Each structure stands twice: as structure tokens, then as C-alpha cells.
Amino acid sequence: MSENNPVKYLADSDTECQRCKAVPAVLITRKEAFCKNCFIRFIRGKQRKSMIDERYKVKYGAVQEKIGQQKVLLALSGGVSSLVLTDVVASLLQEQIESHKGRMGFELVLLNIDEFELESLNKRIEEILPILVERYAPVNIQYKVLSIESFLIDRAMIQKVLLNKDFTAIAQRLSDEQNKYTVADMLKLCPNKSSMEDLLTVIYEELILRTAFIENCETIIYGHSMTRIANEILALTVRGRGSSVYKAIADHTVQFMDKEFTILFPLRDVLFAEIIAYADLIELNKLEVKSTIVKSKITKNLTIRDLTTNYFSHLDATGYASTASTVVKTGEKLGAPQFKHSYGRCQICGVEIYQDPKEWLRRITVNDAAPIETEEEQEYVNLYKEALSSSETLDTENTHPVNICYGCIVTLSGAKQDTAFVWPLKDKDTNHEDKKVLDEYILTDDEE
């Protein structure tokens, strides 16, 4: 273990725990020595503080009648952070059951979106879920496993999208014969790995909100650590989604199908190294689901999130873990965009558009090429023109304009004109899905 690591493990140490002052410490973090029990209590305290609201407490009488029994959806990837959040929340429910004669302050639903094939995982989530749920008896924990293909619930929404050179986007409806795309097929049409990563985030967020709506949950919680949130701030900024930073780092509410959901990050004040230490101490790491894909060492083959993850890992290893806290505190100053006028919603990702990205891009784009000076340069120009003239374009008579945000313009840049890009387009004026269609979105405990 590096001396610069934010968590320093102590083996056979005489150092006394600075909290209880009764037993030897097992690790040092934030310049404080902790024994096992005090460190576990310290991490769990972060979640307790985040979910201190009356909604998550055991309620009686008038308060129970007014608030009712809350239902919380936990996004479980199977990674160490989501497993730690599950343990922390389930332990709270165990304490409530013990202290209140079997009563709980809220119901807990675990949701996993199956990434076994997509991420080449070392085990299926179905292998660990029964073990995980049994671990916290007598807490009654529900769990759902969704296929990523659940994202497609109305094929009539799937259209071919093309980004023009003036940054406008047009779409064309597909015939029944053409409309055979799966989610995996659509992702393969992404111009690069970062674009695929960006659109996967859109898919996951949509599936989580749909499930929360169907399951009548009021709160959605994510296991993001402080390090992960700092990572998200940088990644969103690079991907052109700066207007969404405030939603990725702070507790907030979102509207979906005319229902309001509370989004919480209970581990937002915990470093990733501390999450790993917690998992080690309570032996949660044996349940962790990991990708077997070996990340490339060549920078150009990495996604934006890979790059930002490597950046913060390097900072942790060199003694600058506090940088994550600085990034998060800076990001917290970025509230929701304040604009009186809205350009509707992006029909690809669903975010609200506050400024016309096409107009801004036209203003900053240099349209005149540098003068051609050599024969080699002229040859490249000729090849470029030939490629443009030979590429298929959508039949403009059967197309219609698409409302698209700056982040999705960045994501679609580089998509091939002959294949274009295929995606289920949303209505530009609302973030709602057709209620009749959503009613067909059936969930089971073992859906695949």
C-alpha cells in the first residue's frame, strides 16, 4: 500500500483508535486513526446524514398518515460502491426493525441493469443477489434485474438521425423491414467508445426512472463516492454536458410522467479509497461484480470516463486525493441553468435546452480552410470531396428536423453518413413517455 494512499492500513499496530480510545486502530484516513467498528460507524454516519429526512424514519400516527410508507430504489451495478451503499442502507433498516418492533422507515428495492455481455462481467448479478438479500434478514429487500433491451418499448419511435455540417439534425422514419434494431445494434453505430459510453448513461437513467415510476418509488439513490462525482464533473464537461453537472453532483428532484422523484447520493462525502476499505473490513468484496475487459494503455483507445478515472487514480496514488473534494466543491457552485426561455428538450437524451447550440457552434466555427500549398494536400482534398459525394444521405423529402442539445451534437459528431445513427426519438416539448406504452413495461424479479 502506497504511503500516499488516502487510506493507510495498520497491521499489528499499537496505535489507539482516536474515536473510542479502547481498541487498536486498523487504518488511518483523513489524518485520524479508526478501529474497525468506529470506521464502519463513520461511513454509515455519512448515509444517515444524507437520509435524515422524516420520510426515511419509522413513522407513527399522524405523521404516518401524512407521509405514508416511502419506497426507495437503489441503483445496484454490482460494483463495490453500490454494494457498500446497499450494506449501509440495509443496516439502517436492520436497526429500525430492532428498535421499532419489526417496523421499517421505508421499503428498499434494488435495481440492476444487466451488463453481463456488454461489460464481459466475471459473474452474473443473479448469482450474488440472493446472497446479498439473505445477508440482511429480516429486512425484506425486493430486487429487479433488467435487460438493457428493455430500453426499447415503442419501435415506432426509432428513427435514423443524421447530423449536418451546419450542426442541424434531421431524422427519417424507418420502414417495418428496416426497423429490426436492438439496443446493441444501435450502440454499434456510435462513432466512438466515448459516444457509446455517453448514450449508455442516457439508457441507464431512463431505465432507472421508468422502474421507479412503475414500482411507485419516491426516492432514487446512487452509490457514487466523492471521487466518482468529481470524475463525473470532468467527464460531463468534456462531453459538452455542463448544464447537467448540477444533477450529477447534488441531491435534487426530477420530474418523470408528472411524478417527482428525489435523487440522493448518500456516499457523496466518502472517498473511493474509503469505500474499498469499508468493503474489505466487512468482506463485501467477495460479492463484487467486475468487468474482465482489459483497458487499453493507449490513450486514444480510452473513453472520456476512462481518462478521468485514471486521472483521479493517479492523484490518489501520489497523495493528492483531496483534489476530488476541491472539484466537487467547485462543481457545487454550478446550480441549475437560469434562463427564462427554453428551446424545448433534446429528442435524443431528453435534457432541456436553454441555449441554441447550433447558433453558438456556427459563430465559433471557422468555415474557410487554410490555403492549399502542396500537391499532397490537394490530393487529400480531392479524396475528401469524393468521399462526401459518394456517401448516402437521407431522402430530404421524408425527413424532419430534430431538436438536439450540444452534448448530443458532440456525441453524434463523426457518425457515418451512409449508416447515419439510429435512436428512439422523444417528443421535443416534453420528457414524458406515452402512458399506454409505459404500461407495457412489465417488471419481474428475474427479468432478462
UniProtKB/Swiss-Prot annotation:
Pathway, per record: tRNA modification; 5-methoxycarbonylmethyl-2-thiouridine-tRNA biosynthesis
Highest taxon of the lineage: Eukaryota
Keywords annotated in UniProt: Cytoplasm, tRNA processing
GO molecular function: nucleotidyltransferase activity; sulfurtransferase activity; tRNA binding
Gene Ontology BP terms: invasive growth in response to glucose limitation; protein urmylation; pseudohyphal growth; tRNA thio-modification; tRNA wobble position uridine thiolation; tRNA wobble uridine modification
UniProt subcellular location: Cytoplasm
Coiled-coil region: none
GO cellular component term of the entry, any: cytosol
Main location (coarse class): cytoplasm
Keyword Ion transport annotated: no
Cross-referenced Pfam families: CTU2
Record-linked HAMAP family: CTU2
Function: Plays a central role in 2-thiolation of mcm(5)S(2)U at tRNA wobble positions of tRNA(Lys), tRNA(Glu) and tRNA(Gln). May act by forming a heterodimer with NCS6 that ligates sulfur from thiocarboxylated URM1 onto the uridine of tRNAs at wobble position. Prior mcm(5) tRNA modification by the elongator complex is required for 2-thiolation. May also be involved in protein urmylation.
Family from the record: Belongs to the CTU2/NCS2 family.
Name of the protein: Cytoplasmic tRNA 2-thiolation protein 2
